[in-house]
């Protein structure tokens, strides 16, 4: 699958030439497109450098699928674009940028307002002197400050127009907090430890806005990170793209399981057996407690949980599943459509969490565990079953003899799960591994069951379009080599976890 284009959006006081130190390295990794802001570089100035006009100017240049890498003002604009274009902008890398550039009473970890006003006034009166001062701020505090300053002085543009002062005003007014809170795409904040323009204390403020977003602090770097530590930025981009490549498309997950609602119960033997075993870990009576069933599906286990006396909230990402479950079990629970990685519930609001064979579809397990810990009350417990990387290993082996595409979903292993639990501040009271093996007389019976469950391949990297007849025949022959006297095997590596929030 072609990697989405990386669109580079520069900050104030420069143009797209500022990406020179990282450009060759980035182009070795991904397709790259440079953008000049209106009034900067080769882009004509706007009559007014307003937020709607600037976003429209950038949007007109964006490819159909892209990742935005913005620096400073460019990063703040990238966040705004991602919030407006969630289907087009697949992710954002925010370099040396804050939710607000200028501090306010309710957001103190930013530039002091009087400092910002003084600089803007100086630029209006003596633009060249202000630019020289600005270049010094870009390098201030860096471990290689003198060498960095010398490099940056060669980048100061000669031509200045009315958009520059207007851009400073927009920078002072821009508030990205609401956009960051709602942003569902992956976002990486890269902050500079020695930044003279964006205080490092902003890291905690940014973390509080959206727990799903990643934050990394680059040690020893000033504001011009891509000049100070170019290789670290290139490596961060590479890691970000790898995360995108393995992330499960949640919309496709929801559509896949939603379409399977009517057929799910008829073929869900494995799911029933695993869920029943997970139920045995829960207390028999749950009177006067609040329980969250994550990935409630058709409501089969939701109804059983309700008989134990708990107030049950059933959450699923697939509206089709919720509609079906509500019809089958109208009184069993409150039915909520939502994402397990961004739970629509208050902190410390539930006593128990039940989730059977669901979290293997989550793209970011650390964020998931953070969310579970957030909504659990102190002393609350989460009971989880999920699939490990040994799942459908026979299917994987057979396809590997045919092509190099991804045909089996990638599942997280025990070590990564335990690390995510620990990082979320929870304790793992039990971790049980079990292998269940099903047998089918015909290959079409296995593939039919997977499709009826909605559990066919939804990972990026799979083959696009129809699978050719020759490839299907080769796959069928390869799978036949797995046949035993009981039939064609399909193995499932099942994990059972009992977690506790201290």
Swiss-Prot record:
The family assignment reads:
In the N-terminal section; belongs to the AB hydrolase superfamily. Carboxylesterase BioH family.
Catalysed reaction(s) here are: a carboxylic ester + H2O = an alcohol + a carboxylate + H(+); malonyl-[ACP] + S-adenosyl-L-methionine = malonyl-[ACP] methyl ester + S-adenosyl-L-homocysteine
Region of interest called Malonyl-ACP O-methyltransferase, as start-end residue ranges on this chain = 225-502
Active-site feature positions: 72 (nucleophile), 195, 223
What UniProt keywords apply to this chain's record, in alphabetical order? Answer: Biotin biosynthesis, Hydrolase, Methyltransferase, Multifunctional enzyme, S-adenosyl-L-methionine, Transferase
GO biological process per UniProt:
biotin biosynthetic process; methylation
One term under GO cellular component: membrane
UniProt-listed Enzyme Commission number(s) = 3.1.1.1, 2.1.1.197
Q: Record keywords: Hydrolase included?
A: yes
What function is annotated for this protein? Converts the free carboxyl group of a malonyl-thioester to its methyl ester by transfer of a methyl group from S-adenosyl-L-methionine (SAM). It allows to synthesize pimeloyl-ACP via the fatty acid synthetic pathway.
**Gene3D superfamilies documented for this protein:** alpha/beta hydrolase, Vaccinia Virus protein VP39
What InterPro entries does the record point to?
Answer: AB_hydrolase_1 (IPR000073), AB_hydrolase_fold (IPR029058), AB_hydrolase_sf (IPR050266), BioC (IPR011814), Methyltransf_11 (IPR013216), SAM-dependent_MTases_sf (IPR029063)
GO MF annotations, alphabetized: carboxyl-O-methyltransferase activity; carboxylesterase activity; carboxylic ester hydrolase activity; dethiobiotin synthase activity; malonyl-CoA methyltransferase activity; S-adenosylmethionine-dependent methyltransferase activity
Q: SUPFAM superfamilies in the record, alphabetically?
A: alpha/beta-Hydrolases (SSF53474), S-adenosyl-L-methionine-dependent methyltransferases (SSF53335)
What does the entry list as the binding residues for substrate? 12, 134-138, 223
Name of this chain's protein:
Biotin biosynthesis bifunctional protein BioHC
Q: Where is this region: Carboxylesterase?
A: 1-224
Copy the pathway line from the protein's UniProt record: Cofactor biosynthesis; biotin biosynthesis
């Amino acid at each position: 699958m072609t990697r989405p284009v990386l669109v580079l959006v520069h900050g104030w006081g420069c143009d797209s030439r500022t990406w020179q130190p990282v450009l060759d390295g980035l182009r070795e990794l991904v397709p790259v497109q440079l953008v000049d802001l209106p009034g900067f570089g080769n882009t004509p100035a706007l009559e007014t450098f307003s937020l709607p006009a600037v976003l429209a100017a950038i949007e007109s240049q964006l490819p159909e699928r892209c990742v935005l890498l913005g620096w400073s003002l460019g990063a703040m604009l990238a966040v705004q674009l991602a919030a407006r274009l969630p289907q087009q902008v697949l992710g954002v890398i925010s370099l040396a940028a804050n939710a607000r550039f200028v501090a306010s009473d309710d957001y103190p970890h930013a530039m002091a307002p009087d400092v910002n006003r003084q600089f803007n006034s100086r630029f209006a009166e003596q633009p060249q002197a202000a630019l020289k001062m600005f270049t010094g701020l870009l390098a201030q505090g860096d471990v290689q400050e003198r060498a960095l300053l010398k490099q940056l002085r060669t980048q100061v543009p000669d031509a200045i127009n009315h958009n520059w002062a207007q851009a400073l005003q927009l920078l002072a007014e821009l508030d990205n907090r609401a956009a960051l809170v709602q942003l569902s795409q992956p976002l990486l904040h890269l902050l500079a430890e020695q930044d003279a323009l964006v205080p490092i204390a902003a890291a905690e403020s940014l973390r509080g806005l959206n727990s799903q977003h990643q934050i990394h602090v680059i040690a020893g770097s000033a504001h011009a990170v891509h000049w100070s530590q170019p290789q670290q930025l290139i490596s961060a981009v590479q890691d970000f793209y790898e995360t995108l490549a393995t992330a499960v498309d949640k919309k496709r997950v929801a559509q896949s399981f939603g379409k399977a609602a009517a057929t799910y119960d008829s073929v869900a033997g494995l799911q029933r057996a695993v869920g029943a075993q997970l139920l045995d870990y829960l207390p028999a009576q749950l009177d006067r407690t609040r329980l969250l069933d994550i990935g409630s599906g058709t409501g089969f286990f939701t109804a059983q949980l309700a008989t134990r006396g708990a107030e049950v909230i059933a959450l699923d990402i697939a509206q089709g599943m919720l509609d079906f479950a509500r019809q089958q079990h109208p009184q069993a629970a409150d039915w909520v459509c939502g994402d397990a990685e961004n739970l629509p519930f208050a902190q410390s609001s539930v006593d128990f969490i039940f989730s059977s064979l669901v979290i293997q579809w989550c793209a970011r397990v650390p964020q998931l565990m953070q969310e579970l810990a957030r909504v659990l009350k102190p002393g609350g417990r989460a009971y989880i079953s999920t699939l490990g990387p040994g799942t459908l290993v026979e299917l994987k082996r057979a396809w590997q003899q045919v092509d190099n595409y991804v045909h089996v979903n990638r599942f997280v292993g025990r070590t990564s799960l335990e690390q995510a639990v620990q990082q979320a501040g929870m304790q793992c009271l039990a971790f049980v591994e079990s292998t269940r093996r099903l047998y089918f007389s015909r290959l079409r019976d296995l593939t039919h069951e997977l499709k009826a469950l909605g559990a066919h391949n939804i990972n990026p990297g799979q083959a696009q379009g129809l699978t050719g007849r020759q490839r299907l025949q080769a796959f069928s022959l390869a799978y036949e080599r797995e046949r035993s006297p009981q039939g064609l095997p399909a193995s499932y590596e099942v994990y059972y976890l009992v977690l506790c929030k201290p």
